[in-house]
Design a protein with these regions (language model features):
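N-terminal signal peptide c-region/cleavage motif recognized by signal peptidases
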Residues: 18-20
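Boundary/junction segments of secreted and surface-exposed precursor proteins
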Residues: 23, 479-504
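A contiguous strand-loop segment
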Residues: 24-133, 153-280, 286-288, 292
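Substrate-recognition/cap regions that form aromatic- and gly/pro-loop-enriched pockets
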Residues: 312-440
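Histidine-centered catalytic/metal-binding microenvironments
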Residues: 412-479
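A short beta-turn/strand-edge loop motif at beta-sheet boundaries
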Residues: 494-495, 507-515
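Short, surface-exposed alpha-helix to beta-strand junction/turn motifs within ectodomains of secreted
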Residues: 511-536
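Acidic, glycine-anchored loop motifs typical of Ca2+
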Residues: 528, 543-559, 565, 571
């Protein structure tokens, strides 16, 4: 009976996951568990379909009386405070507008990231005035003086407006402490402070198990959190009046959420990396562990690059599903070293999947390089839920697309992956040395002039970003050596016909040795379940003929338009990739095509 109930719950969870979803993975290392004595926060932002990440510095601001905060069209309108802090904003720009993906660190060194933990018993709870979603993270970034202050701000907003998403865990951290707070649809919440000697970890299921609700220094919760679970039939104490066996995650979330492969495998991968022990039981671990050996920032980077040993990888691509910590939907990865002086905080960021990108150091309070965005913060804020086609267009002048192209080639071409891993190791060894020296120099300058120190750190940010961009460009230049041509200037999503794609031959490249069974054409972005685009077009026909008159036979590959345009965005200039194998060697190329209705 228990197995059938779990199976039914799994079906319900999978049905929920068929909608556009956001996932993520987070690791928090307490300062006493950290080799640097700093709180470390690692976070992978995992999303579906076409996502463009940009980095902004939003300056501190003074606001007019009566100003209202408006984000999602249906959400509550919230009064703005007089003064807001400056913050680094990682935007995940989506055609549909994302409420739950952006990351922040403000001028006080307060970090905000989150993990989707939906499917809870609170699905029918109500909220006020449309409730709050995106506003939680943005308002905490704007107003929080500390991590604890950020938690209190989130709780106050939850009480007043209520959360409109079914469930999510926010990690809010600063140089002194790290908190994780679960917000559920309606007005209930549970927050837990990560102990200084712990490593906390979280995929996409509620992690809090048994909590000491009397320990109000480290645990904060809605007053009726246990009684409500009893009323809902989600919890029955073994002994009446004795709540010592109360497990928050078991009461408020179906076990099916934790046993989903995408959730359990990522947690098990992290646990094995931490302990050397193989885990199999989803109820056999706490929300955090005390570790014997201190954890370094480099180790947190390796955690965020974690891959499941059970992933089969049979499709030709390295990343296929969400069972890896670093997976097909990882659009942004960060590791924060939260310094005693927030201005000297270091963040390591990859502009995509961290196993296929470089972790690049920067001092976030000194601001990003101009090339890390292509809009100003005010325009980007307006675009958050109203992005135009032009704002989502591919452009070689937008640096983010070079990083995305590099990882697309690396993912399909094992030879490029092997070469890149050597570059990655050398780059990051040097980066740790350089950022240590830069941090020491900035601390010296800070004693003379804060402005000079910030200018120095901003220069470091720009140079290291440019260096990482240069390495990504080298990958693209080395891998993207074969020309393709899509024979239509635009493709319609409603077209039931076909389109020809020409793969041109060269003196050292025999296109007639193309393997049709290992050839695909379409969008490289993940689907709505954060898995490989399985709708990508396969050849309907392949003809070899000399298209360009150079005496060499080119491959003219006919693809169904429906598959070629799957997961593309209407009105947008999309990049479409040809993934194939020629003479036994994985090969890829791309062209841009405007997609119409």
């Amino acid at each position: 009976m228990q197995k059938s109930l779990i199976a039914a719950s799994v079906c319900a969870v999978l049905a929920a996951l068929s909608m556009p979803s956001q996932a993520c993975f987070t690791v928090v290392v307490g300062k006493d568990a950290s080799s640097t004595g700093e709180i470390l926060v690692g976070h992978n932002e995992d999303n579906d379909r076409r996502i463009i990440t940009n980095q902004y510095w939003v300056p501190a601001a003074t606001h007019k009386a009566g100003e209202m905060i408006e984000f999602e069209a249906s959400a509550a309108k919230i009064p703005q405070v007089e003064k807001t802090f400056g913050f680094w904003w990682t935007q995940t720009l989506s055609p549909d507008g994302y409420s739950f993906s952006d990351g922040f660190i403000n001028e006080n060194g307060v970090v905000v990231v989150s993990n989707n933990c939906n499917v809870t018993i609170e699905e029918k709870e109500t909220f006020n005035e449309g409730g709050i979603g995106y506003g939680i993270r943005r308002i905490v970034a704007e107003r929080a003086k500390s991590a604890r202050d950020g938690v209190n701000i989130a709780i106050d907003l939850q009480k007043k407006y209520g959360y409109f998403h079914m469930g999510r865990t926010y990690t809010i951290a600063d140089r002194n402490e790290a908190w994780q707070i679960v917000l559920m649809r309606g007005h209930r919440y549970v927050a837990r402070r990560v102990a200084d000697n712990e490593v906390a970890f979280l995929a996409n299921a509620i992690s809090f198990d048994k909590l000491d609700f009397k320990d109000t220094k480290n645990v904060l919760a809605s007053p009726d959190i246990i009684e409500h679970a009893i009323e809902k039939g989600a919890y029955k104490p073994a002994k009446a009046g004795d709540y010592s066996d109360f497990s928050f995650r078991k009461a408020y979330q179906p076990e099916a959420r934790r046993v989903l492969p995408r959730n359990k495998e990522r947690v098990f991968t992290l646990l094995e990396m931490l302990t050397g022990r193989e885990y199999k039981d989803v109820n056999d671990y706490p929300a955090a562990l005390v570790v014997e050996k201190k954890i370094s920032p480099q180790q947190v980077q390796s955690f965020m690059r974690g891959h499941s040993k059970f992933e089969k990888r049979l499709s030709g691509w390295y990343h296929e599903t969400m069972q890896d910590i670093c997976n097909i939907g990882t659009f942004d990865s960060v590791v924060y070293q939260l310094g005693a002086d927030p201005k000297l905080t270091v963040v390591w960021r990859s502009a995509g999947r961290p196993s296929e990108q470089l972790y690049t150091p920067s001092f976030p309070l000194a601001g990003p390089a101009a090339a890390q965005s292509y809009m100003d913060p005010a325009t980007a804020t307006l675009a958050q839920f109203h992005a135009t086609a032009q704002q989502l267009d591919y452009s070689a002048d937008r640096a983010i697309y070079t990083f995305l192209a590099a990882q697309n080639f690396i993912d399909w071409m094992p030879e490029e992956r092997a070469k890149f891993e050597n570059v990655q190791k050398a780059f990051e060894v040097q980066a740790f040395k350089d950022v240590g020296e830069a941090r020491a120099n900035a601390a010296r300058l800070m004693k003379v002039s804060e402005t000079k120190a910030l200018d120095y750190m901003h220069g470091f940010n720009v140079r290291y970003y440019d260096a990482a961009l240069g390495e990504a460009a080298k990958v693209v230049n080395a891998a993207n050596t074969h020309a393709i041509a899509v024979t239509k200037d635009a493709l319609s999503k409603s077209d039931a016909g076909t389109v020809d794609v020409v793969l041109f031959a060269a003196k050292d490249f025999d296109a007639t040795k193309l393997d049709p069974k290992k050839t695909f054409f379409g969008s490289p972005y993940p689907d709505g379940s954060i898995e490989l685009n399985k709708e990508m077009a396969k050849p309907a026909k392949v003809v070899f003929k000399d298209v360009d008159g150079d005496g060499l036979e080119d491959a003219v590959i006919t693809f169904p338009v429906k598959g070629a345009t799957a997961l593309t965005v209407e009105g947008v200039l999309n990049e479409l990739y040809l993934f194939t194998v020629v003479d036994g060697k994985p090969t890829a190329a791309f062209e841009t095509v405007r997609i119409t209705k």
